[in-house]
């Protein structure tokens, strides 16, 4: 509940071993093997978990790299819309390991809605900026799900977390977390994360 409070979400999942696993849980909750996703390329910091060598590829997703706006180190909105209209992805992802500017979440959310896709924002490296309100909350801008690592800019224990306002996605992630991908609840890590969240209040 503290994670949900800090990130202004209706649902939060903390039974997540890492940020990479947060992405996998989210991919599994939205997609099935063979579905198409559009992801930020590595040239603008797109994370390996969104690509073929990472969990998106291991899960069997069809991965297409988004066109880039090299001046702002993010996706090119006009070209992304053309690509999404052509490919009809199940999921579009945004965010990454290197972030010079805030990403155009609202514009990408509009594209996702237009083509019937969901939008995942990977906040592994920005979640502290979001918790501290230095950057806008992706959920407020139209992201369906936000994934994160809890030990980078958030300053918590090793692990991951997922926040969403979508009850359907939250229910699927709950079942993926247990009994799907984890078999125990790490009380010590959860307590450490709770203390971290209290620091952000």
Model-assigned labels for residue ranges:
Residues 1-201:
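Conserved PLP-enzyme active-site core in the AAT-like
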